[in-house]
Amino acid sequence: MNRRDFLNITATAAVGLAVAPVPNALAADGPSPTASHLPRWRGFNLLEKFTKWDKGNPPFQESDFAIMADWGFDFARLPMSYLCWTDPEDWLKLREPELKHLDGAVELGRQHGIHINLNLHRAPGYCVNPPKEPLDLWKDEKALEACAFHWAHFAKRYKGIPSDRMSFDLLNEPPAVPEATYVRVVTRLVEAIRQEDPKRLVIADGLKWGGDPVRGLAGLGIAQSTRGYYPMQVTHYKASWVRGESWPEPTWPLKEGAKTVDKETLRKERIQPWRDLEKQGVGVHVGEWGVYNHTPHAVTLAFMRDNLALWREAGWGWALWNLRGSFGVLDSQREDVKYEDFRGHKLDREMLEVLRG
C-alpha cells in the first residue's frame, strides 16, 4: 500500500467511523510537539505486536483506545516485533495484511485523540528479550540495512500524518554498547526516516536499557525516552526473566543494607541526569514503567506516586507497561486487590486513580 492509498482509506474510514470528540482531562496541550519539547503525553503500551504469535497476531483493539480516551489518556506506545510483518528468511519482504493492522491503530488513534508511538521492540539484529537475533545490529551491516529499510518504509507509509498524532521510537532499550556505536546506528536510522519524511518526530531510547541519557545524540534533532523501572527489586519482584524470584519482598522506600532508595534517590539518580540533557535541547518522555503483579499493592502504589510526582515536576509524559496484563490496570491478576468489573475486564480502580491524579 502506498501513502496516498493509506491516507485515502483512513479519510474514508473517518467518514463512516467518526466518533464524537472525547473530553480529555489529561491530554497534553500547547504547541505542536518538537524534538526539543515533547508534550506531557500519558498513556499505555499496547502489546498486540510485541512478539510474533505462531497463529498470527490480532489487530489492535478499539476497546483499548476507547477506554484510554474515556479515562483521559492520550498516548499509546506500540512495542513491535519486526517478525510480525516480515519473512524471517527475507527481512526486506513485508507482509501487507499485518501492516494494515498498524494502519488500523493509526486510525483508531485519530478517532480517539490518542497519539501513536511506533517502537521496534524487536528490530533486525537486536532485542532485549530472548531469543537472540541471528545477526548483530551493532556490528552487522546487513542488520542495520534491514532496520533502516523498515523505518524508511514506515516514514513513507505515514508521511503526511502530523507529529502531534504520530512519532517513531527507534529501538527498545539498547544495551551497554559504546555510545559511539549507538550514535552511529541511530544516525543511520534517522537519515533513512528523514529521506522519506523530514518532519517526522523521532525518539531514541537511552542507553543501558533506557536508563542513561545519550548526549552524543543531542545534535540529531531527536527526543529521548527514559524508563521508570528503578529499582528493579521493587518493579520486578518475582519476575522470572530477571531472576527476581529470590529477591526479598520489597518495601518503598527500599532498604538495601545501609542504603535507602527513596524519592530523593530517584530525583538525584534518575531525574537530574535527564533534566541536564534537556538543557541541550532534547525533549524527554518515559516510554515504559510499571510494577509487576507480585509486588505488594501498597508498595506498588507508593512507588508509583513518587515517580509520577517527579515526572509531573519535570513536565514529562509517560506510558505505563501495560494497559491489560500483569503490570497494568486491567486484568493484572494481583492477589491483594479488590477488582472492579469494568467492560469485561477486572479493573484496579485504586491504581487508575493514582495514574489520573
Over which residues does each language-model region extend?
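N-terminal export signals
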Residues: 5-25
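N-terminal carbohydrate-binding accessory modules
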Residues: 27-75, 276
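Acidic/histidine-rich helix-loop elements
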Residues: 46-60, 89-93, 136-139, 235-263
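Surface-exposed, active-site-proximal loop segments in enzymatic domains
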Residues: 53, 82-99, 124-142, 330-336
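An active-site-proximal structural segment forming one wall of the substrate-binding cleft
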Residues: 65-73, 94-120, 132-166, 186, ...
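Active-site region of glycoside hydrolase catalytic domains
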Residues: 141-260, 269-292, 313-319
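Aromatic-rich peripheral "rim/lid" segments of glycoside hydrolase catalytic domains that contact
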Residues: 296-357
